[in-house]
A protein has these predicted regions:
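Short beta-strand segments at enzyme active-site cores
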Residues: 34, 58-59, 98-105, 136-143
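A short acidic, helix-capping loop that chelates divalent metal ions and anchors anionic groups
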Residues: 65-75, 109-114, 146-150
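Alpha-helix N-cap/helix-start motif
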Residues: 14-17, 42, 114, 149-153
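Flexible, active-site-proximal loop/turn residues at the rims of small-molecule/cofactor binding pockets
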Residues: 38, 107, 145
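N-terminal pre-domain/capping segments
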Residues: 1-98, 126, 165
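Residue-level preference for long, well-ordered alpha-helices that form the structural scaffold
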Residues: 75-78, 82, 114-117, 121, ...
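Hydrophobic alpha-helical segments and helix pairs
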Residues: 89-114, 118-121
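Acidic/histidine-rich catalytic cores of soluble enzymes
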Residues: 19-31, 46, 51, 119-167
Length: 167
């Protein structure tokens, strides 16, 4: 049987984030996902999910703070930021009983060394997967299509499979 989750980052966006959980339940969803839940303390988020009878099935790790940032995973100069933010996300996910965390790669440009970026991303994902395993949180990779996300590092399923197999 198919199960659907509402993405409360986008649905019901005329109300606050916590209210979107109840709105999702009212619309018949038993699960939600959210890209940026971190403004809500984890205890409040957990209580809101329980009150609505809804499961948080996926959150995104913080993707950086710069305009156009779509992840921290490929940058040699941001490894400590990647680890700090990913650890925060894994702990938050565990605190709200969310077992899946999407970790974004990042944007490339004409100066990006793609082989170097792949090595850094692979190492970062391996680090995140090990930490996630200790907290019961699975790390997910999502290739983004290059038409809507030009310059995003991870654009092909085969590329994601190759990275996972290398880890």
């Amino acid at each position: 049987m198919l199960k659907f989750a509402s993405n409360i980052t986008y649905l019901f966006n005329n109300i606050d984030l916590v209210s979107r959980i109840q709105a999702s339940a009212g619309a018949g969803f038993q699960a939600v996902e959210c890209q940026r839940p971190y403004d809500i303390p984890s205890a409040k988020m957990r209580r809101s999910l329980a009150d609505a009878g809804v499961e948080m099935v996926l959150i995104n790790a913080p993707a950086g703070d710069g305009d156009g940032d779509k992840g921290l995973g490929i940058f040699s100069g941001r490894i400590s930021e990647f680890q700090r933010e990913t650890e925060r996300a894994i702990v938050y996910a565990a605190e709200i009983d969310c077992q899946r965390l999407h970790v974004m790669a990042g944007q490339t440009n004409q100066d990006t060394d793609l082989n170097g970026a792949e090595t850094i991303f692979k190492d970062n994902i391996a680090w995140a997967a090990e930490l996630g395993q200790r907290h019961g949180v699975r790390i997910l990779l999502e290739p983004l299509n290059p038409i809507d996300n030009p310059g995003y590092f991870l654009t092909q399923a085969a590329q994601a499979v190759r990275l996972v197999e290398a880890i």
